[in-house]
From Swiss-Prot:
Keywords: ATP-binding, Kinase, Nucleotide-binding, Transferase. Its EC number is 2.7.1.56. GO terms for cellular component: cytosol. It comes from Haloferax volcanii (strain ATCC 29605 / DSM 3757 / JCM 8879 / NBRC 14742 / NCIMB 2012 / VKM B-1768 / DS2) (Halobacterium volcanii). Homodimer. Induction: Expression is highly up-regulated in presence of fructose. Belongs to the carbohydrate kinase PfkB family. Disruption phenotype: Loss of growth on fructose. Growth on glucose is not affected. PANTHER family: 1-PHOSPHOFRUCTOKINASE-RELATED, ATP-DEPENDENT 6-PHOSPHOFRUCTOKINASE ISOZYME 2. Catalyzes the ATP-dependent phosphorylation of fructose-l-phosphate to fructose-l,6-bisphosphate. Involved in the utilization of fructose as a sole carbon and energy source. ATP binds at residues 214-219, 245-246. It is an enzyme of class 2 (transferase). This is 1-phosphofructokinase. Gene3D superfamilies: 3.40.1190.20.
Length: 305
């Protein structure tokens, strides 16, 4: 079983405008989507669609927290959240003719007692894999993440920002940086695939068993103990990139839970992301739809190690 922990979940509000945004102008639209969001929650939604046994956890509070719970219940996704006093945040993505704008809140204040309850929740669920995804809310630190990682006999997956990956010092199962997070975590310039390979191998050397790097239109890389694998992105129309990296992690974890190989797990990550970017918001892809393009993703070995 996979337990996803989202310390700082959100209601994702995605708005679409056909015209460029202008200062001082009131822009109106009927094209708006509200979804339950946050990296761990997204992974839970996508992995569940891929027939993985998954439960979503983390901190929720207030009206927006209730929205997240209700939406997960409606989608048939198991959840076991810790209730906190402050409100869950609202994150807004604006898709306009002149680009994509992201407006994120910091999140609620978390108390030490909340972290204690989260650790107890994880222990009660006894997962095989525990994923920590997204930013940390005020009051929670990386030492709390490490405590969560060591609180049970489970594999730890992390999908966090580069500033967090730079500080983590533990033998974790897998991390999933994107290009900018690879750069932030290693202090390297990451522009080419070769740059990404070097940065990902550095993270692997720090103790991650797998480094799964999502590179947007350039696909994804997987660094293992034995080799570096590469999978190209599918040529699809991109509507919204929100949740794309989460989809890569979801496909990987779901495939590993089903006993698939490293190459097939990387392929599943790329396939899942290819479906997610085709719709606005973090809507859940259908497994049958994901597998439609299975033969179109050729995984290659970049190098052996």
């Amino acid at each position: 079983m996979i337990l996803t922990v989202t310390p700082n979940p959100a209601v994702d509000h995605t708005i679409h405008f056909d015209e460029p945004l202008q200062t001082g102008v009131v822009h109106r639209t009927d094209d708006a989507v509200f979804t339950a969001g946050g990296k761990g929650i997204n992974v839970a939604k996508y992995a569940s669609a891929l027939d993985a046994d998954v439960t979503a956890s983390g901190f929720l509070g207030g009206h927006f927290g209730k929205f997240v719970r209700d939406r997960l219940d409606a989608d048939g996704i198991a959840s076991d959240f810790v209730t906190v006093d402050a409100d869950t945040r609202l994150n807004t993505t604006v898709l306009a003719a002149d680009g994509e704008y992201k407006l994120n809140h910091n999140g609620p204040q978390i108390r030490a007692a909340d972290v204690d309850e989260l650790v107890e929740t994880a222990q009660a669920n006894e997962p095989d894999t525990l994923l920590v995804g997204g930013s940390l809310p005020p009051g929670m630190s990386l030492s709390d993440v490490d405590r969560l990682a060591r609180a049970g006999d489970w594999k730890i997956a992390v999908d966090m920002g580069g500033e967090y990956l730079a500080e983590l010092d533990a033998d974790y199962y897998v991390c999933k940086p994107n290009r900018s997070e690879l750069a932030a975590a290693t202090g390297r310039t990451v522009e080419t695939e070769a740059d990404a390979v070097e940065a990902a191998e550095e993270l692997h050397a720090r103790g991650f068993e797998y480094v799964l790097a999502s590179l947007g239109a350039d696909g994804a890389l997987l660094v293992t103990d034995d080799e570096v694998l590469s999978a190209p992105a599918l040529d699809v129309e991109v509507v919204d990139t929100v949740g794309a990296g989460d989809a890569v992690m979801s496909g990987f974890l779901a495939a590993r839970e089903h006993g698939l190989s490293d190459a097939d797990a990387l392929r599943m990550g790329v396939l899942t992301a290819s479906r997610v970017v085709g719709v606005a918001g973090t809507r859940v892809p259908d497994l049958e739809d994901v597998l439609t393009n299975e033969t179109h993703v050729e995984v290659t070995t970049v190098r052996t190690r």
